[in-house]
């Protein structure tokens, strides 16, 4: 496909960015995560070039405020993004649905119980034929010396697919980087003239030089920050096959700036030599997937999965409020959690695609019931978010109806009671993800035997759950553990793609989102987890990328 294009054209817990779970406030425990600042200097001369450096007095910022005007009458000017949101719609509005479940539907009345609960946000399915939101996309492409040959051709082909699928209301920009970064294409509307220019710039790409990932991302962030107008859905797609040893301390602030500019950030690493640790850290901070493309011929599919998801965003800035009627011990989620009190918290989710769900696993401390109470209210959940399905080009602020989590109180325990299947499945997802993260840390340190022991223990816990029937989630997690064991059996297996595949898997399960459906070819196990998280619209885009 690439050559044809060129010829034709000429502890079982995880939490967001922390080493432990989101706990209730404690006077003896403070968050360990700290944002590290990063600064850049631009090169003199070419206004589209930038090089990484420590901050120097008088460094001149580049101007990238030459984006094409939006053609959409409902477009929101960038300056208006900071204005207060309108009052929420009536509580019965909105496209997302909320539900709650508790591990055991009946709890002993006379004693305190610790139980798991589950709050699920579900987005409805939509059709690709429906009118979608316009997008601002910037592809940040590695054109260092290691990209020569087929790698660069595959990247060009992937970008061409994005161009071909774009609507005239979409805008696309290109940033390339090797030793320096360059804005190759300003943010252009994908009408006929814009498409032609985008294709021409894609064909001009050539490989050579070093790898300055941070410079490429800095340039893309500046473009997004300086836009005169913004499409409602915006994203940076960063693709590299290399390592930038100076980037780690620079990237956290860039992720924050991208978020402040209303922009998602997706990272793609391919080949055995890219810095999977760095890219997965960026993805974790950006609250997006890290995508490992094991074989270069799948770059096009990976881009299609990401862009197809972005084309189906139905909600942004989701704030899930959890008001506990009992103590809320722990909130298990990869997303930002703000504790309000011992029994209340707010979970912030950047966006949700059509057909996606987000599951928040909770640990609750339920006190003994007084008197002869038959039911206990455990928690009330509600969501506030920008709904993109109600008015084209505008996020209408919605406040959902509240849903309750309750449990029956009985005189005696029920030893034969089965735990709720869905709560158990999501609890297992959390546990397996934590095991994968811990095993990856062992493998990074060369402790492959310790990693194997940890994965074996996780597999035994999974198999000893005592289920009558294996669920789809259970089977996918079992396959994930089997694949990871193959990738952590030796230094060679770990460094030749193992690290990247496991980091990809960890982020996928944490976020409940996937962009690349291609199964691993070297792990020896056909994994089903990727298809478990891919949405119908993403899959349709992926299939389209294979057929056109």
Feature locations, PLM:
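Extracellular adhesion/glycan-binding regions together with long Ser/Thr-
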Residues: 333-357
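Low-complexity, intrinsically disordered segments enriched in Ser/Thr together with acidic residues
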Residues: 353-372
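Local beta-strand/beta-hairpin segments that build beta-sheet-rich folds
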Residues: 184-186, 359, 374-380
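Long, acidic serine/threonine- and proline-rich intrinsically disordered regions
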Residues: 11, 34, 366-548
């Amino acid at each position: 496909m690439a050559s044809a294009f060129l010829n034709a054209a000429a502890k079982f817990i995880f939490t967001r960015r922390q080493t432990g779970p989101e706990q209730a406030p404690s006077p003896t425990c403070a968050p360990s995560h700290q944002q590290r600042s990063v600064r850049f200097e631009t090169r003199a001369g070419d206004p589209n070039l930038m090089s990484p450096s420590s901050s120097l007095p008088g460094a001149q910022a580049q101007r990238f405020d030459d984006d094409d005007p939006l053609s959409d009458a409902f477009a929101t000017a960038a300056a208006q993004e900071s204005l207060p949101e309108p009052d929420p719609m009536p509580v019965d509005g909105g496209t997302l649905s909320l539900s709650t479940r508790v591990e055991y539907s009946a709890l002993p009345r006379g004693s305190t119980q610790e139980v798991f609960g589950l709050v699920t946000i579900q987005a409805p399915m939509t059709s690709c034929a429906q009118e979608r939101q316009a997008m601002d996309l910037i592809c940040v492409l590695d054109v260092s010396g290691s990209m020569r040959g087929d790698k660069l051709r595959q990247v060009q082909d992937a970008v061409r697919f994005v161009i071909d699928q774009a609507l005239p209301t979409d805008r696309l920009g290109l940033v390339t980087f090797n030793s320096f970064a360059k804005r190759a294409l300003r943010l252009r509307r994908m009408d006929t003239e814009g498409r032609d220019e985008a294709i021409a710039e894609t064909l001009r790409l050539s490989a050579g030089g070093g790898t300055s990932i941070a410079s490429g991302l800095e340039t893309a962030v500046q473009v997004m920050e300086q836009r005169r107008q913004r499409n409602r859905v915006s994203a940076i797609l960063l693709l590299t096959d290399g390592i930038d040893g100076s980037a780690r301390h620079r990237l956290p602030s860039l992720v924050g700036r991208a978020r402040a500019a209303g922009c998602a950030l997706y990272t793609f690493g391919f080949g055995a030599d890219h810095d999977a640790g760095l890219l997965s850290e960026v993805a974790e901070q950006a609250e997006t997937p890290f995508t490992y493309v094991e074989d270069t011929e799948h770059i096009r599919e990976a881009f299609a999965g990401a862009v197809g998801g972005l084309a189906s965003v139905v909600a942004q800035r989701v704030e899930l409020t959890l008001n506990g009627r009992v103590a809320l011990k722990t909130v298990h989620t990869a997303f930002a959690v703000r504790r309000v009190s011992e029994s209340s918290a707010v979970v912030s989710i950047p966006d949700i695609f059509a057909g996606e769900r987000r599951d928040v696993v909770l640990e609750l401390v339920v006190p003994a019931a007084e008197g002869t109470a038959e039911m206990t209210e455990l928690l009330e959940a509600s969501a506030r978010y920008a709904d993109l399905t109600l008015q084209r080009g505008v996020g209408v602020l919605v406040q959902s109806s509240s849903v309750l989590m309750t449990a029956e109180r009985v005189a005696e325990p029920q030893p034969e009671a089965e735990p709720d299947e869905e709560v158990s499945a999501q609890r297992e997802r959390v546990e397996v993800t934590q095991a994968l993260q811990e095993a990856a840390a062992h493998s990074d340190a060369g402790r492959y035997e310790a990693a194997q022991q940890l994965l074996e223990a996780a597999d035994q816990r999974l198999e000893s759950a005592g289920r009558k029937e294996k669920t789809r989630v259970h089977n996918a997690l079992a396959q994930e553990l089997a694949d990871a064991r193959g990738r952590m059996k030796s230094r060679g297996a770990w460094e030749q793609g193992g690290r990247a595949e496991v980091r990809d898997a960890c982020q996928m399960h944490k976020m409940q989102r996937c962009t690349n459906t291609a199964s691993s070819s070297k792990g020896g196990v056909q994994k089903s987890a990727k298809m478990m998280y891919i949405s119908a619209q993403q899959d349709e885009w992926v299939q389209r990328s294979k057929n056109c």
